[in-house]
Design a protein with these regions (language model features):
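Short loop/turn motifs at secondary-structure junctions
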Residues: 44, 166-169
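Composition- and surface-driven signal marking solvent-exposed, interaction-prone regions
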Residues: 62-71, 99, 145-146, 154-161, ...
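Aromatic/acidic polysaccharide-binding cleft in carbohydrate-active enzymes
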Residues: 2-129, 137-138
Length: 173
């Protein structure tokens, strides 16, 4: 249920994970979706690492996609870098019970058609991934929502045992 990282057969630019020279927003969305699962299952997932981290922007590199690229004078951060930064800077101490209810009545999904090394089977995955946690020191409630699809999704959000909470800030990547 946590796997949004799946190769697509769409002809749209930057939809395949192996066709670019650098990380793109599709990579970053897939990573963010996966990381909501890491955080939601923090009692099981003790550690996660991102590799490879650095690649030479103008030279030979071992991997097709890295988190950051460098030259002699510059450091280029990819969308994946900013997703990692968001999850690092805004992680709670414990998970908060929550529920999303969708205006459509059911959770939206995405379907990918397999091809090449993945076989011919199609795969359906969730479009929305989320996690809610709380910072013990500040009392902040941290809500991370990833829409891995192209369409807007309307939903209501409820937090167990919490009423009258005011929205203080919205941060996005």
């Amino acid at each position: 249920g946590e796997n949004i990282v799946y190769e697509s057969t769409n002809d749209t630019a930057n939809t395949r994970f192996d066709d670019g020279d650098t990380s793109n927003w599709l990579n970053a969305l897939a990573e963010a979706a996966m990381m909501t699962g890491f955080e939601r299952n923090g009692d099981i997932v003790k550690l996660a690492a991102y590799a490879p981290m650095f690649g030479n922007l103008r030279g030979t590199r071992q991997w097709a996609v890295d988190m950051m690229y460098y030259t002699n004078t510059a450091l280029v951060r990819t969308p994946s870098y900013y997703v990692q930064q968001l999850f690092m800077q805004d992680s709670g101490d414990y998970k908060v019970q929550s529920e999303l209810t969708f205006a459509s009545g059911s959770a939206p999904t995405l379907t990918f058609e397999g091809s090449g090394t993945r076989g011919d089977a199609s795969r359906t995955v969730d479009q929305i991934y989320y996690v809610v946690s709380a910072d013990e020191e500040t009392g902040d409630i941290l809500i991370k929502i990833v829409n891995a699809g192209e369409n807007s999704v309307r939903f209501n959000f409820s937090l167990a045992g919490m009423e009258g909470i005011q929205l203080a800030d919205i941060a996005g990547v």
